């Protein structure tokens, strides 16, 4: 009996060694290109998906195990903190019995969460991962049967192509090939049917696991929130019982470090109710008092700015009258003979005139108020010539020119060009431009000086420069006044 068993075991071992040798030989021939390897693209794709699914499943299972371990650690830490709090809480303090119930419920809640997490999440993932090993073994077996099938096929082809035919060897080769083909095709077909089903089952597994985790978290956090509110109420009762006790951190005998008073915690109503309670804050100074007192100051400041602007313009006009003595008389008389700044037909301003007006505005803002008044300025020679020519044109034209000066144009019209020697005019957008009109310098001087026109013309002739510029200025003033009469007739 013992000899028979030993012989059978030896025969089985020899048979296995022969298979391993035959498979190794076939693989070497396939790598060298001596034989053709059978391939199935459909199975290879399914096998690739399986290996990817296996790697993802093992990674998720490992992370869930770490998550459960962390929950256990948190459970133990929370339990120790609760037990220590119960030990230090004196029995004569308010809420001693309530604290004992809170600590017990806290421990039970952690235990329930830990057990259900292990049962509904970790065990489900464990069952899902456990089937990978079986499928992996079947895929490896299918690979071995594929090598046997290729080896039997190549052996049959070699026997059939031999020069010397042997019917016994041919029959034996055909029988071995048929067996290897049946075994391989059956196993291959089973895997082709099972692998896609297993690959699609991963979706249902993930849904089940994470639905269970989310539900367990929801229940756990909701119940834990209730326990936290109960604990906060117990501590609030203790605070009311000993309201005269203040938590102070002393400086530990350090001269540079002061004692600190710990602020009270945040109210618990912020978590339970949508509107958080209003905590007492330090009174804030109302902003209405400074604004009420600042209104008169702003009004007075605005008035001072307007006064300084008017004084600056007057002083600018006196400075310009001094500069006119050296400027060109033709340009000064032409610009002075124009109507008011807001006249109906202003000429387009040239770039040079605009630059000059900007420079005059800058100089007027820089001048200090009160340096000179317009009504008291001494008229320049150009102004005297202008007054003489204006009086000789007739009373009717002077009345129409005065009426034109009194009219105000809409604020959208630009100001007329001004030469460097003419009087200053208020801009349309300035506060003074809407209420006051720009007038030639001759109007205040003509009203205050009662001398006749002939005497003033002689004085102007005596103080003016050469005769040629005076003739040109007289001609230009006459043309300008005639054009104004033609426009209003």
From Swiss-Prot:
GO MF, any single term: phospholipid binding
Bilayer topology term: Peripheral membrane protein
Residues that bear Phosphoserine: 273, 357, 380, 392, 420, 422, 424, 430, 435, 439, 443
One GO term describing the cellular component: cell cortex
Biased segments, Acidic residues type: 311-331
A Pfam family matched in the record: BAR
Ranges of compositional bias, category Low complexity: 267-302, 358-368
Alphabetical keyword list: Cell junction, Cell membrane, Cell projection, Cytoplasm, Membrane, Phosphoprotein
Amino-acid biosynthesis keyword on record: no
Location in the cell: Cytoplasm; Cell projection, Podosome membrane; Cytoplasm, Cell cortex; Cell projection, Phagocytic cup
GO biological process: cell chemotaxis; plasma membrane tubulation; podosome assembly
Disordered: annotated span: 267-489
Disulfide bonds: none
Coiled-coil portions: none
BAR domain segment(s): 28-244
Protein's UniProt keywords contain Phosphoprotein: yes
Function: Promotes cell motility and migration, probably via its interaction with the cell membrane and with podosome proteins that mediate interaction with the cytoskeleton. Modulates membrane curvature and mediates membrane tubulation. Inhibits phagocytosis. Plays a role in podosome formation.
Summary of subunit composition and partner proteins: Homodimer. Interacts with BIN1. Interacts with ARHGEF6 (via SH3 domain), ARHGEF7 (via SH3 domain), SH3GL1, SH3GL2 and SH3GL3. Identified in a complex with ARHGEF6 and GIT2.
Domain observations: The BAR domain mediates dimerization and interaction with membranes enriched in phosphatidylinositides.
This protein's name: Bridging integrator 2
Protein species of origin: Mus musculus
